[in-house]
């Protein structure tokens, strides 16, 4: 037969105690024990020695002797002793199997020194007859005997049994410093994240399990099988933990519970199993299974200060490992901390390996301890642990102390501080997905080893020159500040900023102590997350498959935006204007701007807003809105508006900036501490921020005098993917935000799974903006729960990423668990808040569903919404023209006008009185009259102040001092010196079209009463702003009801300067024109240009004006206007030759009409006059769109004998006005234009020839054909 020890070892006493309780009251024992205890047959708790083969023999309780006497010691049975059943006393006729032996009392040793039991004597059960005599009281100095029962008896029995195990013990002292320092890192991380702690025993226990894999013999135990010695090798390592428990009676008890299959566990699993065993032991919830099968034990007497112990080894185990106290060597225990740190003395911990010498040899035990030693000092061991716990930083490394002087190391510490300030963000834990979980966030510059420092320097003090408010600090404390400031859930880039004051301001706040949000603030953050997630979940459930470009995975955006706006309200600012792409837009509209849910749900139902009945309208995730934000923890409020945007990513950026600048100029608080009270809050996508050039163009405007808005808060929703493009394919830089360094903006990279960090950064960003009036960038790293849209499957292109995302808990859940874990809120409070919000959505949804459904009809044109007045007077008094002329010579005293500019100014005064007004002065006259009428006029563009063609000189520069004089600004006061309210703002723009045009469009939206003009250097370059033209200027009114009256001045004309200095692309604007969306004009006289601008200023409608302006005509002496053309006329959309309107020309002689526009008119007139062609009349169409049908028909009707009509243009056949006019003229006026023919250059892919000689030949051919017989 085989022999084996009890499976419970030293835990057998506990099993018997459980059995006793079970017999008395089964409900008092955990149900997990019931199955085991039903047929449990315990041994009596008498002492017995082991047999020679190690098997303990069961012995019956002896009968009590007839007279009081010490109980004889039981005889040790030999191998032939009958089993306990044959030796049981026959005091009960019932079968012994039905009554467990544990209920029978074992015989007790009687002693004269033990007082008699009063209860026993009274009942007559003392063993004597008659009255009981009082027992004599023992003397104070007499010995007392106490029968060991229960646990104590079991321990005694087990200890006696352990004497049969021949043991030996190996001892090894192990440096504990690395464990200490890495445990600090681990527990600090856990404290900041999910909570919990790692103990030294966790680390040592895991190292023991790892070492057993290398030395499996340490896991074996000895047993005799069929009388033969055997070494039993268990299938797994079951690590027994010695757990000290305090009973209800105050006595301490020791149990050993097993972590089963510990060898198959990773560190995280091991810790979970370890904590589960300890927790259940303390709660009395251990089961029989937990006590059985221990193969190797770990005991830690060091917790009570024991340095070195040799524990007893129980049968069934091969070894027990003892852990001693963690102490400095005895000879240094009286030394000061400073002395110990200077000497590089670390604490030691003593491990003992007590093993069964029958199957384990001393060398093997020694090697085993050496392996544990090596593991606890190895890089790989702690790397594994850090990865398992999700700690993104490298562990502390075991290295030899560097003997360099403290002075040398002081300099290295200063270098280390600088390195963290510069590159700490590279080590920050900012990626919520941690896609490369095996890679630590590290950089050589941030490694203490790189700086010649080691773990031995951690407790040494160094001079830190005021760092964190101290002159001297321990390196450990320095690193704590640096890592908390730069390497947690916020990574900061600010050392690229050139201004020391700004760096210092940020540094103080980043490295300073951060106040934890109050419980009320945490609950508010949670409510914002609830709202963000519930809104998306609701739409996903109710409108399955509909595109909405959800915010799921980036819900922290909502509390972050909320914090920005709240902080702006705290600063008592006037408004926050939001610009953003389509992702998350509906969520922002609902939870930030406050757009009614009913309106959003109606759009999902397909119900059109009555205000958008005209025009094309747009998809719901492009629309804008406005509302009022009320502070949750303050008394202020602030206006919040969201600008409409197209799907062209980042195209809205300059538009929003222009809109904000317009609002600021209306408030007119200036560039002061109290100025810039309208705050731009711009949301971006990561791929777009790095990829779209307009981002850099818009950033470049940030600090320019004519464009600055006092700082934009940029919030990048960094979902680490662009549709299907990975970051590696989307940018060449480390971060998508690197482009923002060009303007010295501080950049904060924030882990989107930490809403408290996002809120802290958002508030800091507003404070920085208010202090320094500069942009701030917040890079919120998150993820996209679904595909680019709700119908997309992103796992086709990013399978690994979406494997992580599909199993990832949302930020609301993780944040809720953190609050509950800290006891800030209860689970019920969290769920109630979420259900309340969901209930609100459900109620509104049901109301919308019940609304009457209207039949969808085709939308109507927006053209009828704004009609140009037919008889608008634009003429001005001659005295006003004279005043504008005088202003050009009213230079300040001592001002030196450039000698080439002075004649221009003098000529202008002359023109104001005598006429022959040229184009440039006619423009200034128009603007000057507007300023005198109280209009704000803003003119900008490349080289605009002087003019590309040296024609404007709107600002005169002092030749000696560089000071400026702006003549038209004098019109801001009337002749009596009273302010008119007008302003003239003229700026040279940066070399940009996209951002510059977008800015001016936005400005015109933000200030509808302003006259906003942008001039291209050459009209050809307007295609750099094509997205703004297509998405905003031509269609903003139709799509969003967004009104603008921006003016684009585009120099245009074929003059032999090549393909890129010829055309403003008339054909493109005419193709885009519809529904009266723009006014497109090509005026040919200075006076008509004057009236065109004034009409646009006075007509009361808000639509863009596109003017194709001249180049060579600027100095054409024929292209001038008389004073009466300004004082008596108005804009004329169709012009005849002066010979027919002001002279004696005979219309009856005309048989051929040449219709044209622009400067070629002057070439046609010159040719006609040269050839005296009275049969040819030239009619100019000055307004190309809307086409002046009535005026054109009236003009043509004046020529009764016309036989042929030609459209003459210098542009190629496929460009200019002809592609539109060739179709629309015969359709609109069939009686007048059926059969009209074209005279032009041939169709060309480029606007013109690159050769001036070829140009001249082509131009001559046009004229020849126009006047051919």
From Swiss-Prot:
UniProt binding sites for acetyl-CoA: 1079, 1095, 1130, 1133, 1183, 1190-1191
Active site: 357
Reaction it catalyzes: glyoxylate + 2-oxoglutarate + H(+) = 2-hydroxy-3-oxoadipate + CO2; 2-oxoglutarate + H(+) = succinate semialdehyde + CO2; N(6)-[(R)-lipoyl]-L-lysyl-[protein] + 2-oxoglutarate + H(+) = N(6)-[(R)-S(8)-succinyldihydrolipoyl]-L-lysyl-[protein] + CO2; N(6)-[(R)-dihydrolipoyl]-L-lysyl-[protein] + succinyl-CoA = N(6)-[(R)-S(8)-succinyldihydrolipoyl]-L-lysyl-[protein] + CoA
Pfam families: 2-oxoacid_dh, 2-oxogl_dehyd_N, E1_dh, OxoGdeHyase_C, Transket_pyr
Region (2-oxoglutarate dehydrogenase E1, N-terminal part): 1-41
Gene: kgd
Biased composition range(s): Basic and acidic residues: 23-37
Protein name per UniProt: Multifunctional 2-oxoglutarate metabolism enzyme
Example of a GO cellular component annotation carried by this entry: oxoglutarate dehydrogenase complex
PANTHER family (UniProt xref): 2-OXOADIPATE DEHYDROGENASE COMPLEX COMPONENT E1, 2-OXOGLUTARATE DEHYDROGENASE
Composition skew (Pro residues), residue ranges: 63-75
Compositional bias annotation for Polar residues: 43-58
Segments of this protein annotated with the region Linker: 42-107
Organism: Mycobacterium sp. (strain KMS)
Region described as Disordered: 23-145
Region (Succinyltransferase E2): 108-378
Residues annotated as binding thiamine diphosphate: 583, 647, 649, 686-688, 719
Example GO molecular function: dihydrolipoyllysine-residue succinyltransferase activity
Positions with a binding annotation for Mg(2+): 686, 719, 721
Region feature (2-oxoglutarate dehydrogenase E1, C-terminal part): 379-1269
Role, per record: Shows three enzymatic activities that share a first common step, the attack of thiamine-PP on 2-oxoglutarate (alpha-ketoglutarate, KG), leading to the formation of an enamine-thiamine-PP intermediate upon decarboxylation. Thus, displays KGD activity, catalyzing the decarboxylation from five-carbon 2-oxoglutarate to four-carbon succinate semialdehyde (SSA).
Alphabetical list of InterPro entries matching this protein: 2-oxoacid_DH_actylTfrase, 2-oxogl_dehyd_N, 2oxoglutarate_DH_E1, CAT-like_dom_sf, DH_E1, KGD_C_sf, ODO-1/KGD_C, THDP-binding
